[in-house]
């Protein structure tokens, strides 16, 4: 149980502002990263009886959010409102555009998940909003519904939210990782080869570790919507065989996120584990830490470039299972937070990264909370992060900063993605030698004065 919880109210220039305190810890900023809700498959295999025309909900077609997915995020939105508005009195009772910012990847299912979630937070007919002021007071407009902007960027260049964004460097790192002894030993094992071989025969196309996820994901969703028909039309499908294929895919997903038993996993002079975590989870982890640093730096500052972050209380990312898992992998808590090992976060999973300031020692702390799926609550995962205390929900912010620095992309991610792996290595080596030489020369010159 949380002890010594109090709600402290203060007055600011723009009206009544509230803050939540847990003992001496004052909540000042929240960042939320969630996965979209239930959806149709994004693609499937050649012999699958359930092709794109089998999926009619959500506008129809591949990768669309279902009514169940919309409901999952409506529920999560209500939970977030209950936490941050009702219980913590941290976010405003009525939507405030300066305090909440939402960024989604540029696909329907994440954008509509964000809309559904915000409907749960600020779109209910609960007298928290005013007709004619917050929404049109006309027939046909849902009572209480306040539309909230959801921002996005081009999906191909969204290196924060979309782990499949165009990034040749990331592809090169994965191809190199596949040549490591650990991955080759796994792929060439008799059990893995047997499953991949059987799926190749069943699916009418070559199946390997790169496209296995398409099959396991399609079958997962088809068990929800077409379970009986699936087993009749695909008579090779059994629960036991699916479990084997899914377990193989879980291990592949660990590899794809830079998680190896061999540490460091060096291939041709490159640590493929670190490089993978840098190029996948590094950007979003560093984006979150950048927001935190700005929030702290701008405290007490009234300059125009601080106005946005000073007002902001909640920054939201609406994204994917791959995004959350890459984020957790960057912090090396993927297996602590998500079960089973290698399994991706479920529909409407969410990470809450909360920033606190201690009113006594004046130091910043963070707390990380995880929502596993619809129907589950919020669980503290802070203690799973290496270096964080095992007897507290709060961790020194420098621990998070150190992880971010360690896993920060070597260049701005847009540039790094277009860098050749081998050339960047050579360039980095030459650059380090050049810098070392300059420092040596400087030291010699300094010795003359």
From Swiss-Prot:
Extent of the signal sequence: 1-19
Catalysed reactions, semicolon-separated: a phosphate monoester + H2O = an alcohol + phosphate
Topology class, membrane: Single-pass membrane protein; Lipid-anchor; GPI-anchor
Subcellular location as annotated: Membrane
Gene disruption phenotype: RNAi-mediated knockdown results in a maternal effect phenotype whereby the majority of F1 progeny of the RNAi-treated animals survive to adulthood, however 80-100% of F2 embryos arrest during embryogenesis.
EC category name: hydrolase
Family: Belongs to the histidine acid phosphatase family.
Designated name of the protein: Intestinal acid phosphatase
Lineage: Eukaryota, Metazoa, Ecdysozoa, Nematoda, Chromadorea
